[in-house]
Regions:
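Nucleotide-activated chemistry modules centered on ATP-dependent adenylation/adenylyltransferase
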Residues: 2-233
Length: 233
């Protein structure tokens, strides 16, 4: 039996779930929502590529995803999709997850998107079809300032996926820190919002304790460069 997301009486009719990629934008969105006076997320929802057992696009192992959710103190809903997933299959799987417990109780899904209007419109339209709404706590924020705010808040992350068409593969496996920001080419968004890179957050104020992990091998797959992150301890 699942635990109702709003069982503590806090949320009333504003139960939230957070779309969680394991990266810096979703972690910062969680931090922002928890710091606000309004409702904060009661669950995380993540797409996992079943063929690989990893977070879709980011390539992070399932075990590390579970450790993030545990450290964040939130239940995790994994939506499994196949490799090379079509949009129709993705929408069917996601729609099913949103209609079932515990996400059926969530009226609002929060996202860490920053400025891509077409992505926002897509999310809002798809959620409206199932009677839910979207919220974007970081929307419109300056990405240069946001990247530095992330570091200043005490978050620690590593680049786990790089698009070699937009950023040199040598950035895969590097820590997301001031030195990395200084080294990024001028045409690369400091938050990677255009898909230049993705991150894995292993420490920060949204976690009860850091996630013990270390960087492993770097591989190229499906046109992207992935840095494997392994559990430690």
């Amino acid at each position: 039996m699942h635990t109702p997301l709003g069982s503590d009486g806090w949320y009333g009719h504003a139960v939230l779930a957070l779309s969680w990629s394991g990266g810096k934008d979703s972690a910062l969105a969680l931090h922002e929502l928890r710091e606000r006076s309004g409702p904060s997320p009661r669950a995380l929802i993540t797409t996992v590529t079943a063929d690989y057992g990893r977070i879709s696009m980011h390539g992070v192992r399932r075990e590390l995803l579970s450790r993030q959710a545990q450290a964040a103190g939130l239940p995790l809903v994994e939506v499994e999709i196949p490799a090379a997933c079509s949009n129709d299959v993705y929408e069917q799987r996601m729609g099913q997850a949103l209609a079932e417990a515990p996400l059926a109780e969530a009226q609002t899904i929060a996202f860490g998107d920053l400025f891509l209007a077409d992505i926002r419109a897509y999310r809002e339209e798809r959620l409206s079809r199932v009677g839910k709404q979207a919220t974007f706590p970081l929307w419109g924020r300056d990405t240069n300032a946001l990247a530095r705010e992330f570091i200043a808040a005490g978050f620690q992350a590593v680049l786990v996926c790089v698009d070699p068409r937009r950023l040199d593969p040598s950035f895969a496996g590097r820590r997301f820190d001031p030195e990395l920001l200084a080294d990024l080419p001028a045409d690369v968004d400091p938050c990677g919002e255009n898909g230049e890179f993705h991150t894995f957050v292993y420490a920060g104020p949204v976690f009860s304790a850091p996630i013990a992990c270390h960087v492993g091998a770097t591989v190229e797959r499906d046109g992207y460069v992935f840095c494997d992150v392994l559990t430690a301890g």
